[in-house]
């Protein structure tokens, strides 16, 4: 199945894994049974992502859904809205896709939907894509991010072998937002609490990384979260990590919709290639 044909999946379970984080367990149901199509594209990247596809009410779309056909035949104001989320886990044996959604009240499209969705609902899912996996040969792994990067950070820690060393800086609202992460690696996990400050407005991650005692040997770094990380943490880490050992990207931008965020990323690529 081509990428223009998203997989049609069923919400199997909904779990609140934190006060602001809801896990959607997706798979095959009675009506939507697209897991095999999704799994066929799976490459196992730790930062694998999918796009949840939200259809406009009252519009007749091609069945099966073909996004290329939609864009060619329907006006742009009824094109589906796509929202990107990192895959927390894809379990081929259990035939489940886990997607963790940060809840922001009534803001946006995906958050309000995730806040009220119940098992049995269906959703189209495009992807997965991805590009990062931890190299077991690295001497140390540095993982930096906020809630949006937490699924990828957790997936990375789960794949690290015994004896691997990692340091994690993760910014969340407070202690209740800290998650249990299972790993056999030697991990120093440091939670940074922003308190009443809004996400994307603090210097907690930048300050923590700059105060960190850089270890000897080869360091592989993963730096993802709100766009300010590109201007603060990225330059500092780039001076210390080989280009091929650095995965750095913004997952979101304060005050921007995903459409606006995509435009901003395109502008950044134009002025700073690579």
What are these language model-derived features?
Residues 1-274:
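Extended, composition-driven regions rather than compact fold-specific motifs
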């Amino acid at each position: 199945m081509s990428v223009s044909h998203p997989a049609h999946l069923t919400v199997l379970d909904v779990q609140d894994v934190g006060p602001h984080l809801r896990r959607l367990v997706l798979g095959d149901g009675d009506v939507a049974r697209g897991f095999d199509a999704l799994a066929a594209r799976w490459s196992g990247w730790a930062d694998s992502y999918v796009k949840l596809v939200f259809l406009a009410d009252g519009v007749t779309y091609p069945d099966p859904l073909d996004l290329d056909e939609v864009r060619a035949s329907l006006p742009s104001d009824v094109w589906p809205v796509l929202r990107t989320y990192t895959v927390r886990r894809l379990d081929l044996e259990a035939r489940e896709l886990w997607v963790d959604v940060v809840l922001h009240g009534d803001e946006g499209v995906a958050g309000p939907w995730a806040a009220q969705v119940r098992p049995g609902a269906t959703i189209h899912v495009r992807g997965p894509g991805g590009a990062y996996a931890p190299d077991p040969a690295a001497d140390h792994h540095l993982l930096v991010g906020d809630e949006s990067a937490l699924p990828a950070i957790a997936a990375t820690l789960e794949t690290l072998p015994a004896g691997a060393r990692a340091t994690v800086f993760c910014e969340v609202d407070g202690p209740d937002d800290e998650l249990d992460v299972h790993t056999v690696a030697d991990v120093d996990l440091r939670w940074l609490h922003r308190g009443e400050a809004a996400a994307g407005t603090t210097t907690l991650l930048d300050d923590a990384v700059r105060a960190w005692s850089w270890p000897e040997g080869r360091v592989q770094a993963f730096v993802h979260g709100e766009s300010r990380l590109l201007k603060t943490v990225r330059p500092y880490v780039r001076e210390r990590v080989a280009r091929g050992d650095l995965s750095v990207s913004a997952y979101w931008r304060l005050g921007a919709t995903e459409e606006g965020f995509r435009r901003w990323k395109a502008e950044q690529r134009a002025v700073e290639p690579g």
